[in-house]
Structures are given as C-alpha cells and as structure tokens.
Amino acid sequence: MPSLSVVPLMPPWLRWLCGLVLAIALGVGLCRLIAESLWFHQLGYLEVVWQRWSVQALLFLAVAGVSQLFYGCQQQWLLRQRTVTLDPALRAQSTYRGLGLWQLLLCAGSLNWLLIVATYHIGAIALQLWQQRSEMTFNSPLLPQLSVWRVAELSLQMVQTPWLLGLSLVAVILGLWLPVGLFQGLGILLSLAMGAIASLSWPVVLKGLFAASDPHTEPLFRHSISFYLFQIPLWELLRLWLVNLSVVGLGGTTLGYLLANESLSHGKFLGFVRSQRRHLQGLSAFVFATVALSFWLERYKLLYSTKGAAFGAGYTDVTVRLPLYGWLSASAFGVACLLAWSAIRRGGEQRRLGPIAPGLFGFTLGYLGVILIVDWLLPTAIEAAIVQPNQLQRELPYIQRTITHTREGFNLEKMRVEPFQPENNLNAEILAANAATTRNIRLWDTRPLLETNRQLQQLRSYYRFPAAFLDRYSLKLAPDQDQSEIRQVLIAAREVDYSAVQQFARSWINEHLVFTHGYGFTMSPVNTAEANGLPKYFVRDIGDTGQLLVNPPQIRESISFFYPRIYYGELTNTYIFVPSEVPELDFPRGTENVYNHYDGTGGVPIASWWRRLVYSVYFRDWQLLLTPNLRPDSRVLFRRLIQDRVRAIAPFLRFDSEPYLVVADPRSEQEIAPRPSTAGVNYLYWMIDAYTVSRYYPYSDPGEHSFNYIRNSVKVVVDAYNGDVTFYVVEPEDVMIRTWQRIFPTLFHPLSAMPHQLYRHIRYPIDLLQVQSEQLLKYHMSDPVVFYNREDLWQIPKEIYREKPQAVAPYYLITKLPIGATEEFILLVPFTPVNRPNLIGWLAARSDGENYGKLLLYVFPKQELVFGPEQMEARINQDPVISQQISLWNRQGSRSVQGNLLIIPIQRSLLYVEPIYLEADQNRLPTLARVIVMDNQRIVMAPTLEEALKQLFPQ
C-alpha cells in the first residue's frame, strides 16, 4: 500500500484544468487592470486611482490575512489539544458532571448555528457594500453589528427563507460530524468576507487616518465634530471585525473541544482539561474585550438616538444609559482582564476536568440580564416616572442641541432670516422698474418643452432630448443693443441614442464606429412663444453647413457654439472607436447625412495589437481583434455617461441627479483642464454638483434621509467633446472636503481656477435645496418650547399640474431680492403652515458671484393673509371666464394642461403666474394657449404674458 506522501492530491488532467482556469482568471484580471489604468492615465488621474487601489489591496490583504492567521492559530491549537487522552481514573475522580447526550447536542447545535449566522451576517454586509459601492451610502456605510438581537433577527430571516434554512441545516449536521472542518471552512469564508468589507470601506479608513480638524465641538462629550465624522465610522468598522473574529473564534474552538474524544459516540461530554480551559479563557477574554469596546462606542451612538423628545441624546440617555453603558464597558473589560490572567497564569492540575471557568456561564447570563435592564426596563421606568410628567423641562436643553446641530448639519445655521411685509402695491411703474424680472418669468416648463422638442427638433429617430436645463445667459437680442441682457433660458442637448436605431440597422460597425455622438442643442427663452403657441427658439435645428440656426442673429455675438458635437452625455452608453476608416455620422442634411472624423483628445489610443487584445478582453468583444477599420490614430472612448465618468474618478462623492449643459468659451481665458490640450474647438460642457455627506453628525436629525450632514462642496466640469473632467472646490471650509483634499491633493482645484465663462453658470442645486427645505419645515423653529409643542410646523404647498396635485418643487427665477441691489439668479421654494393653505414664507438660494450659496428666508407676518399656491389654484378654477374657456377647450378634441404656478417676489409684493398649455388628443404637441396672472385681489388671463400684465396693471 503506497504511503500517503506519494499519493497524488488530484489527477494530472484536473491539475491542468485548474491551472488553465487560474491562468484565464489572472489574465482577465490583468487586462481589466491595464484597461482601467490607461483610462485613468488619459484623464490625468492615474495617481489618484492607484492610490485608491493600493489602499484597497492593502486593506484586503491585511484584514483577510490577519483574520485567517488568527483562525489558523486557533485551529492548530484546537487540533493539538483535541488529542489529549483522558485517563479513566481521572474520569472517575472528577466531580464535574459534564453534559449528557441531549445537552451536548443542544450545545453543539447552537454553536454550529451561531457560526453559520455569523458567517451569513458578514457575507450579507459584504454583498450590500458591493452593491452600494458607487452610491452615497458607500461613503458612510451603516454596519449592523453582531449582537444577541442581530443573531435572533438573522435566524428568523434564515428560517423564513427555504434555501437558506436547508443549507444551514446541512451545515449544522456537517459541523456535528466534522467540527474542525466546518470551523476551517467558515474561517476562510469569514476572512475573505471581512477582507472584502475592509477593502470596500476604504473611504472610511482613509478619512479616519487623514481627518482634517474642525473647531466645532458637540456639547455632551466635548469632542470635535471631526471625531464623529471620521473616527467613529472607523471604530465601528474595527468593532465589526473584532466582534466577529472573537465570537467565531470562541464558538468554533468550543465546538471542537465539545466534540473531541468521541463525546457524541460516548453520549457524554466529561469537561475541559486545564490546557483547553486556558485556551477558551483566552478567547473568552477576547470576546469580553470586544464587548467592552462595543459599549464604549454605544456611549457615542447615544448622540444619534431616536428615543427621546428630539433626535440625539435626551434626558434618559444622558442620565441613565450613558453612565450604565460606561459601567457595562468597564465591567466587561474587567472580566476580560481576569480571564486573560487566568489563561496565562501557571499552576493547577493540568488534567483536571471542569467547565471553561467557574461561574462564567452564570456571570454571562447575569450580564445579559443587566443589558436588558439598562437598554429597556430601567430607561422605560425612568422615562415614565421622571421624564414624562415634566418632559418639556427635562428635555429642553437637549431639544436646543438638536435644533442647533441639525441646522449646522444641513448648512442652515448661516441662513439669514428677514421679515417680508407684503405691500400689494404692484403697478405698471413698478413692473417697468423691474423689467429684468418680468421678461424672465418662466412660462415654459421642462416637460412641455421637451415634448415639443421631441416632435420638432429631434430631426432623426436616433436623436433624443433626455432633459432640459434652466440657466441664465447674457445675450444681445437686437442689432442696436450696446449691452447684453440677462435672459433665463431652457437648454436641451440633442444626443444620439443607439437604442433608438432601427433593428435592421444595428451592427457592430454602426454601434461602435458610426453612431458616435450627438449634435447641437436647443435654447429657448422661458417667457414667450411663437404666434402659434409653440416655443420660440434662440437656437434650433442644424443648418446645411453644420451650424445651428439662431434667431436673432446677434445671438452669435454672445454664444460660441461652432460644431457642437456631444461625445459625452446622458445617453452615450456605448464604447466607440474614433477616428476609424469608417466615417462617423455627424448630422443630417435633408435626406442625406454628413460624416466626420473625431479630432479631439479624448479616449485611449488603441492602435497597437496588445491594446486591442486588452480591450477586447475588457469589453468581451472579439470583433475588436478582427476589425480592419481601425487606424494608427484610433482611440477608444468608453465610460461616456457623465454620471458614470465622474463616479469612477470620485466614488466617495454623491452626485446631483441633474447635470446641466453649459455653452461657453473658456479657452479665451484659460484651459478648462490643468494640462495642455490640442483639441478641436469645443464650447459644450457639462456641470455637475457634487456633495459630501455623512450620517454621523452629532445631534443632527436626518429626517427622511439616509444622512444628517451635507455640503455642496464640489462643482464638476466635463468636456462634452474631449471628456476631460475637472473638480472644483466650492466650499473650502467643509471639513469633509478638506479631508479628501489631504487624501487626494492632486484631484481638486480651487474655484478661482474655474474659467470665468463657466463660473458665471454655476447655480445652487435643486436637490440640495429640496433637502434643506424639508428640514426647514420643522427646524425653522429656533425656540425649543415652540419646537416641542410643534406650534409652527410648515409644509411644502401643493399645486395642480395636469389635473393632479403635486408638491411645489424649487424653481429658478431672476428677480431683485428686497436686500439686493440688482436682479440675480435665485432658486426659490415657498412654504405654508401645516393644514393651512396661506403662504407663510419663502426660501431663496442665491447663485450669482460672491453671493453664491447664501440662503435667505423671508417670513410673512402671521396676522397677514397671503394667498398660497392652493388658494390661487382654487381662484383659477372658480373664475367663470377661465373655467368656461378651459371647459370649451376640453370639449373640442383638445386638453388643457395647467403648468407650474410660480410665485414671483417683486420688491415687497407678490405676483402669481401660471401658464395654460393646450394639447390635441392625437399628437399631444403642447402649445402655450394662455397665461394667467394674479395678485392678491385680481386675476386675468391673456394669450401672452405681456398682455396679461397690461390687463392686470393698466397704465
């Protein structure tokens, strides 16, 4: 019989197969690494991504390696101690009764189940982080910790999932048969999963290590805000690792000792010998040390409590839970020290049988009982007996903390609050003095404009207008006009959508070589329409020479947009190879097409055979290797969706849902990118707002959001032709962006480096103001007594759109604020009291120049009745002339659509404007039919805004 040392582990063919699979996997991984590196290098961010990848690899190797080393040491010690032979005489002399068969099965089965639940727990977290790796929650991941309650929750979830239950039962049976094998297998899985969690949590680690200081402190522990934003998440990650490491180590080792010496066959477990007890005591000390760490961290988590009268630590948290958590932490640490001393001290009978440690089981049960009392019974009793009878007095200082820190977390503490006493004295003279406001009142909503664009401006079936963007431009509109005037316009990019190409025309060449880019855009004034009710266009169509058509011609003196090709946009989801031997479709001209070749700097050169091989593997596209259509100067352009592009570079930022197109000529002043460019002329850029967010700002109430801290700290500019991406810091005082600047010093640029022609188009983001306005509904109340009684709750009013009520969204307008010297571009949202329709105030976010980012809250006197949107909608529906006309339209094969109701502040008065669109039942082409204009007393409807204003305010 051959010795085991010469028996092959596997047949040769299987070794070759495994080697081949491993080689293919390594080859694919290497190709992906090279492809991504070339992409980042072309953009100038190779150093940034290599730093990130290095940290991720180091974290994975360190955490997975240390975890496996720990488990491996426990398993080796376990295997050595399992061979201890028990003397029959020693068994007879032992006073320890041990465990009977059923007790042994119960203990072993429970330990098996605990190991499986712990593995499932870590695996679920790793999977969740992988799925959320490009989302905002990835920046501050919420890590559920392993606890008694978590084990119960996961057990219930596993029992209710048939395949999980079946797999778990098989693992339990396997653990009873091969306990050490199960421990080894689960140890490997847990090590890999924890390594993955650490690697995916690289932002948490880097922020914790490179945290910038913040002068602000919270009032309970007096720690810097930086400690909570950066250190607490890092400690939570460390806690997750250590708790699972210790629990699985103790559980797996205990299981191995319980089932040693054929205890199941004998139907009895006689006890642990001294060496086994010392091993288990050391592991128990590790467990209690992690328990001490957990309760130490739970003290800080009281700052995010939801159990009091307001968010954050309340009276019961501070007076009861805080000291008891400290006691629990100290006592657990004391037990850990005693167990560690017991494990390392010498002496005692090495073969004496007994439990792990006398009294440890009873102490653990008592400790769990104390936890139950501390977490539920005692706080509930204190709350009912002491707090509830005098809750306002008890909770008052803590409510004030919540108000202050919530306003800080959502950047509302610098908001300026002003009274707004409505004068209701609008007249023709005042309107003439505010002509810049009235000529920029928005009549066209984005939805009807896009519908019109899709029918009139798409030109071909493969073009799309995915969105329309509101912005302001300085334009010359008349030949004799000396100076430009600020006009609010709607811009929509004409992008190519390959999914809209006819099925018979789809081919590899068309997808990757021909349909490569969109062309042009439309620009419409917001306040007027043509005589037939269709939108008026400043910029439209595509001329025979490729120039966009403009009206009036003076527009060309204000905006440069020659050959506006869009290679990077919101619909560009294909990878392309340009230039190539196959001409690219440039733009349609009548019944024919005009073709072109890309001459920009975007993309990765792909002429060499090895780069073709790399990218054919990367894209899983074998035709790339075989095509004869590539040239020596061909480049591959991929990741062309602008959202994907910026996320790949800075996945730790949260990006706004609405990138917007800017038409500008920054090269007349300086380069858009900090490196030389030889690109062809381009004037189209995408601007994207980026946010730093966290859920760890102390005492800050997140409301309905997954974060309680947000700053619009970064503006991102993407070249629509060359694909260059530049990050500009808008809010340098933000502690989170200062931390990221310390981590990636070459990634960000100061706002002063942004070309002026682009800087003029930065705007306060709608997403941010929506979040802030939602928080302001409750947290505008600065008096804690008023806040506690909910005396002055606000709400976002509703308007009627397409016959359905909807919340009024923040909207842009150009107006002169009561404290302003000139008209400016602002973002406005109105408020009404809860359950009351009258207007109570409005919030304005400023976007121009040095006033960018400043918030102004105008509050109406409570005794003054100011009509809100719902009341104005009711007035429209009740007006006999208007309702009769709308009914007539609806009976004539058409349908009237009420647009957004806008509230326009002009000096100390309010003007209400709502457009009425008309749609035919057949083609659904919306036209502007009427404009309704109102003040506090009168209401008129006319074909144009100018006529309506003249009727409402005659000379």
Curated annotation (Swiss-Prot):
Keyword Membrane tagged: yes
Q: Which residues form a coiled coil?
A: none
Q: Could you tell me the keywords of this UniProt record?
A: Cell membrane, Membrane, Transmembrane, Transmembrane helix
The superkingdom of the source organism is: Bacteria
Q: Name one GO cellular component term.
A: extracellular region
Q: Which InterPro entries match?
A: UPF0182
Family to which the UniProt record says this protein belongs: Belongs to the UPF0182 family.
Instruction: Name the NCBIfam families for this protein.
Output: PRK02509.1
Q: What is this protein called?
A: UPF0182 protein tll1193
Q: What is the lineage of its organism?
A: Bacteria, Bacillati, Cyanobacteriota, Cyanophyceae, Acaryochloridales
